[in-house]
Amino acid sequence: MSSTRIELDQDFIDQVKHEIKPHWGELGWVTYKRTYARWLPEKNRSENWDETVKRVIEGNVNLDPRLQGTPSEEVINELTNEAKQLFRLTYGLSATPSGRNLWISGTDYQKRTGDSLNNCWFIAIRPQEYGDSHIVPTYIDKREKAVSMPFSFLFDQLMKGGGVGFSVVNSNIKQIPKVDNKIDLTVVINKSSKSHDASIKVGAVDKDEWEKQNPDHDDIIYYRLPDTREGWVLANARLIDMHFNNTNPDQKTKLVLDISDIRPYGAKIHGFGGTASGPMPLVEMFIDINNVINARVGKNLTAVDATDICNLIGKTVVAGNVRRSAELALGSNDDQDFIKMKQDKEKLYHHRWASNNSVAINSKFNNYGPIADGILHNGEPGIVNLDLSRNYGRIVDGYQPGIDDDVEGTNPCGEISLANGEPCNLFEVFPYTAEKQGWNLKEAFTLATRFAKRVTFSHYDWEVSRKIIQKNRRIGVSMSGIQDWLLNDLGHRVVTGFEDAVDEQSGEKIKKPIYDPKGIEMVDSLYKAVITADKAYSEELGVNPSIKHTTVKPSGTVAKLAGVSEGMHFHYAGYLIQRIRFQASDPLLPALKECGYHTEPDIYTKNTICVEFPLRAAHADSKNFASAGTVSIEEQFATQAFLQTYWSDNAVSCTITFQSDENDEIAPLLRQYRHTIKSTSLLPYYGGSLKQAPKEPINKKTYEERAALITDDVEEVFTKQNDDQKGLELVGQTDCEGGACPIK
């Protein structure tokens, strides 16, 4: 069916560029240019900000299903005007779509790959049907449950640049049948492949030599991998499924995987972008996964085994230099092997680093001592309260049994509770910036709601996702720079104090937070605006209202664009040095040096340059300003509870930082907020004690001295140097406060 296309004309864009100055943070333009500006081959340069915003907004507005066929003049005018407002909102940096949308929306890759606009996903690790999906193994019926399916889903989404949360709780793992077969795996490669020698070193064998020794293939399953994402996934699926009789119809136990056609290291990846890792990481992954499952022949896989398989997949995906896989493993709270699995340092450094690990709890759970102890040792596990997620939206709206009953887990950063196969779908508004730029906040949040709703009309690759998205239409409208906004509008932080109280169930004495009533009204009114907008738009489109609507995402890279505090987090310090790592060949480096930024070789990675940016937080000199280094653990818990109570009906992503003298408060505070906080994680506050730390707190005098050395605007100098070329790629840059989500 043909469709009408909404486009923004150049005269309008030129007018907006004349009227609105983007609210770049001190790191904003540099972060944008190296992370979200796509290469324009026809112009031999990367995008400028107005071109990125045009691409992104048009890519989104044209998802409105009413544009299929012959839409009315009224619909065309409505969406054209909406596109213009969204352009103004985003160009000025009063709000932005998720980083994933900034990178992918409006590209050919979006049109080809329906999943590409969603940052993160969730899958339950249990046998599942492939169904009507873009990947279905040929050796089984699409309606047959296969152990490989959730691993295939995870592998596919990670390679498309998404993060994946996965559940290995006991109720899922016990559905996996006993391992029937030990598989004899051989990975072969042709001498003509450029990757031949490197692949042999990691365990592959020469194809000609193997053929000589194995002239008879009757008892062998032979699979020659095509040079595609799907080929990698299907090879791994075959390897996993051969271990189980019900998905091994040939009852063969020898598997040969031929990797001769896989492009070599450094070759270009079309679509998502970047360069290939070559087949070597894949060879290692196949061998390692086979060893994990072979070790359980006659027994059941454990939660640790399943997590290892997911981590090995994640490690392989990370080997490509663009995709940064984020994983969250959710285990049972009484599974001590799972909770302690990262204490095996050899396996931690080999692959177990690839996921952040959390445990599933309910509000009756009370054994927080071991969890607090684990957090003190290695910052894990985080906690996810599935009971609250299934039966509550905002806490203030009370118990609503089964309101979100399909929830089984969360995305890697923990701000969206998700059902099996479901993605998060994010857009964030910067209320502090939006107010400064004259926006009515309710209008800004209405535009955000409609943007996110349209993403649910993408063509999704997996049947499990299509079904749950059509049912739930879940969106995640977030706000960032929350501390800046509250401090600006209230004149102080939202937690004004604590009062003595008693926990009604346990009888323990607690300190109950006191919130500024105006702060409550501020977020409550915006929540109601989102609900109203979703209801109206859903009626227009003839679809279900979204099951949940609001969240607080950790932000990070996107918050840097506007220079605001990240999500609900407090600024790391009032004044700080932010260090960002660039590849030594990055064309931004000469401009940064000419502007006076301090640069030096990175002490951890070859061919990498560390650049220091002096930053000042909004309101850094206010007597009511607090940073992550000065705010108490109690106030951070209370602030997260405030947002979960009055703003977010999904969840609130938060990494609470604590000082060494607050260690004993972790377990009591987790217990106190068990009826309020849906997910949280904690990390010790380091305060820049590491050499070349990403963030190093400094005093005002040092900031002023460093800032005085910066003589020019990087964007202007870069343009003058006219050295705009490819290669603007992040090195070791994590997106959110806890480092869980480096997803673009």
Curated annotation (Swiss-Prot):
InterPro entries: RdRp_reductase_class-2, RNR-II_ins_dom, RNR_alpha_hel, RTP_Rdtase_AdoCbl-dep. Signal peptide: none annotated. Residues 690-729 are annotated as: Adenosylcobalamin-binding-2. Allosterically regulated by ATP and dNTP. GO terms for molecular function: cobalamin binding; nucleotide binding; ribonucleoside-diphosphate reductase activity, thioredoxin disulfide as acceptor; ribonucleoside-triphosphate reductase (thioredoxin) activity. Disulfide bonds join C120-C424. Gene3D superfamilies: 3.20.70.20, b-12 dependent (class ii) ribonucleotide reductase, Chain A, Domain 2 (3.30.1620.10), b-12 dependent (class ii) ribonucleotide reductase, chain A, domain 3 (3.90.1390.10). Coiled coil: none annotated. Residues 148-159 are annotated as: Effector region-1. GO terms for biological process: DNA replication. The active site is at C413, E415. It comes from the Bacteria. Residues 169-318 are annotated as: Effector region-2. The keyword Oxidoreductase applies. It catalyses: a 2'-deoxyribonucleoside 5'-triphosphate + [thioredoxin]-disulfide + H2O = a ribonucleoside 5'-triphosphate + [thioredoxin]-dithiol. Its cofactor is adenosylcob(III)alamin. Residues 570-631 are annotated as: Adenosylcobalamin-binding-1. Pfam families: RNR-II_ins_dom, RNR_Alpha. Its EC number is 1.17.4.2. Belongs to the class II ribonucleoside-triphosphate reductase family. Monomer. This is Adenosylcobalamin-dependent ribonucleoside-triphosphate reductase. It comes from Lactobacillus acidophilus (strain ATCC 700396 / NCK56 / N2 / NCFM). The gene is rtpR.
